[in-house]
Swiss-Prot record:
It is found in: Cell inner membrane. Belongs to the YciB family. It comes from Burkholderia cenocepacia (strain ATCC BAA-245 / DSM 16553 / LMG 16656 / NCTC 13227 / J2315 / CF5610) (Burkholderia cepacia (strain J2315)). The keyword Transmembrane applies. It holds the Pfam family IspA. Plays a role in cell envelope biogenesis, maintenance of cell envelope integrity and membrane homeostasis. The keyword Cell membrane applies. HAMAP family: YciB. Its main location: membrane. GO terms for cellular component: plasma membrane. Keywords: Cell inner membrane, Cell membrane, Membrane, Transmembrane, Transmembrane helix. This is Inner membrane-spanning protein YciB. It is a multi-pass membrane protein.
Length: 176
């Protein structure tokens, strides 16, 4: 259910784009992300850092898109967000000795420290590659194809990555 909740602004962006175009879709994404943060704050009293970062990036890049009437800003937004996640994972691990993937998933999984480090690095690399893929699509395909990639391509890549990661992790999980 959380996965669908996380996709909420992207799905609304997609629908608004198909009906009204990129600029209305951008405004819808900003409002949807604000609503998402407000709901999480109301419901749980604590908003994850990743959601705050997502809100900041959509407000800045979405706002620039609307103010300057230039869709390139919203098209760059996923790349900036993915690269910030990648940098955050790597900086936390190597500058502050904190493994953010372990912090997020450590209550659900018991893994050796080197495995957590590999998992953290895998997620950082995955986000870096997604950022590059987004730029490739932005510069080589139509706006409509980019919107389809943003919803279906990145979501599909995420699902495949999680499945492959889960298969890899099974050899480290103890029978309980």
């Amino acid at each position: 259910m959380k996965f669908l909740f996380d996709l909420f602004p992207i799905i609304l962006f997609f629908v608004a784009f198909k009906v009204w175009g990129i600029f209305t879709a951008t405004a819808v994404a900003i409002v949807a992300t604000l609503a998402q943060v407000a709901w999480v704050a109301f419901r749980h009293r604590k908003v994850d850092t990743m959601l705050w970062v997502s809100l900041g990036v959509i407000v800045v890049f979405g706002g620039a898109t609307l103010v300057l009437h230039d869709e390139k800003f919203i098209q760059w937004k996923p790349t900036v967000l993915y690269w910030l996640f990648a940098i955050g994972l790597l900086a936390a691990r190597y500058a502050f000795s904190k493994n953010l993937i372990e912090k997020m998933m450590g209550k659900q999984l018991t893994l050796p420290s080197p495995v957590w480090d590999k998992l953290n690095l895998a997620w950082a690399l995955f986000f870096a590659v997604l950022g590059v893929a987004n730029l490739y699509v932005v510069h080589n395909f139509t706006e409509s194809q980019w919107v389809n990639f943003k919803l279906f391509g990145t979501t599909g890549a995420m699902v495949v990555f999680i499945i492959l990661q889960s298969l890899w992790l099974t050899k480290y999980l103890k029978d309980e």
